[in-house]
């Protein structure tokens, strides 16, 4: 049974939480504390899977509490309840917490958030990797895109369109801005999944402040991996995004689903980015195993990490509160038949796009030769559409003068 801690200096709020969550007592063991020090004392006695804390409290405030929880118990999911709408303050707090929730909050939204977090362990079983992922507060950007966006944002009159276009090419920037915009949109029914919409929602002034003052963007450190190119990884993500969106456009799917497919396609290998940036030595060992044993990179990851990049990426995105459609597309992009996707959507589009991009790419990535999940496609009645998609995608990538 999952264990959750709620912290608020208002006895009335805690009493309301008890009543609201009473029906969930068969799923979660819940504890309640009126101040940070009491919460930390309780956490010293037993571990907690999640902590939900008010932001503004006397003495040690919510951010300081969450920071200490992060230090003591990295894998504990951290959520702040707040009425703050200042994007910079939210961004700075998101260095410590994983998600924000509005205060006053909607009971259904809080229950849904806790349920989503409770289910993330299915994507990533290894506790050491969970600890590493849970401590992240940003993901690095491709160097050329990082310097391009910083130059544009530092200009006297930066262009919102140019900034949005740059963000839409980079998984690290996309994930961070989606995390912030979904936190800043306190209480809105929708969750943002499109990087361009995220930039538009925040506005150019806020993005400037976030990048230049709060430093939410970082640059990927130059590392030389044998058998792996970070440039190829970025190119593959960008192409997969375009292909995934095109597949849903061909099938006349809802425009919002097509945009979700684009975002999921760009982010589908974000677990590789996290592993390469934060665990470079074991990541290189996994790369070496693909050559030494002639195995796929997925199998090599499992041997070295006890996890693979799909699960790592899904765990991170879910922890940061990205929409479930994106999380599931990342989690199951190699084996969509393991999911419960009943219809053609972002998951299937990203799965097929990943395979087609590898087929059509001139620069192959060692150990990465994904295969189509034909059982999944047959279950959706789509096995006869593969040739149509492939023909259209080949045409899409042909130079204009051909």
How should these model regions be labeled?
Residues 8, 54, 82:
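Active-site residues of response regulator receiver
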Residues 11-31:
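Two-component/phosphorelay signaling modules centered on CheY-like receiver
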Residues 34-38, 61-65:
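Acidic catalytic/metal-coordinating carboxylates
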Residues 46-52:
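Active-site beta3 strand of CheY-like receiver
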Residues 57:
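Receiver (REC) domain active-site loop signature in two-component systems and cognate sites
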Residues 64, 84-101:
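Alpha4 helix (beta4-alpha4-beta5 surface) of REC/receiver domains from two-component response regulators
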Residues 106-270, 274-370:
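Conserved alpha-helical "signature site"
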């Amino acid at each position: 049974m999952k264990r959750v801690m709620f912290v608020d200096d208002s006895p009335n709020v805690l009493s309301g939480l008890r009543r609201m969550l009473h029906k969930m007592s068969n799923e979660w063991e819940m504890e309640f504390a009126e101040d940070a020090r009491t919460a930390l004392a309780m956490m010293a006695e037993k571990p907690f899977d999640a902590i939900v804390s008010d932001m503004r409290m006397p003495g040690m405030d919510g951010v300081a509490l969450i920071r200490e929880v992060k230090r003591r118990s990295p894998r504990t999911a951290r959520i702040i309840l707040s009425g703050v709408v200042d994007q910079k303050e939210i961004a700075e707090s998101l260095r410590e917490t994983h998600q924000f929730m509005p205060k006053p909050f909607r009971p259904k939204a809080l229950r849904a958030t806790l349920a989503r977090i409770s289910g993330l362990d299915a994507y990533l079983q290894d506790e050491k990797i969970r600890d590493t992922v849970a401590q992240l507060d940003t993901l690095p950007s491709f160097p050329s895109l990082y310097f391009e966006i910083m130059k544009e944002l530092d200009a006297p009159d930066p262009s919102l369109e140019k900034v949005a276009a740059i963000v839409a090419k980079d998984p690290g920037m996309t994930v961070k801005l989606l995390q912030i915009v979904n936190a800043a949109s306190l209480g809105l029914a929708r969750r943002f999944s499109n990087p361009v919409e995220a930039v538009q929602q925040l506005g150019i002034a806020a993005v400037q402040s976030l990048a230049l003052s709060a430093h939410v963007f970082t640059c990927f450190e130059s590392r030389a991996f044998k058998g792996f190119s970070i440039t190829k990884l970025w190119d593959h993500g960008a192409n997969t995004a375009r292909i995934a969106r095109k597949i849903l456009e061909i099938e006349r799917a809802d425009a919002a689903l097509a945009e979700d497919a684009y975002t999921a396609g760009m982010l589908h290998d974000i677990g590789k980015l996290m592993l390469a940036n934060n665990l470079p030595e074991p990541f290189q060992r996994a790369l070496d195993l693909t050559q030494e044993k002639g195995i796929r990179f997925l199998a090599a990851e499992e041997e070295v990490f006890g996890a693979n990049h799909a699960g790592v990426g899904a765990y991170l995105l879910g922890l940061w509160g990205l929409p479930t459609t994106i999380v599931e597309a990342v989690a199951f992009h190699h084996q969509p038949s393991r999911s419960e996707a009943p219809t053609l959507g972002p998951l299937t589009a990203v799965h097929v796009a990943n395979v087609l991009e590898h087929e059509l790419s001139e620069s192959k990535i060692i150990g990465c030769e994904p295969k189509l999940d034909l059982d999944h496609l047959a279950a959706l009645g789509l096995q006869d559409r593969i040739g149509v998609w492939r023909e259209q995608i080949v045409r899409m990538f042909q130079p204009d003068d051909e």
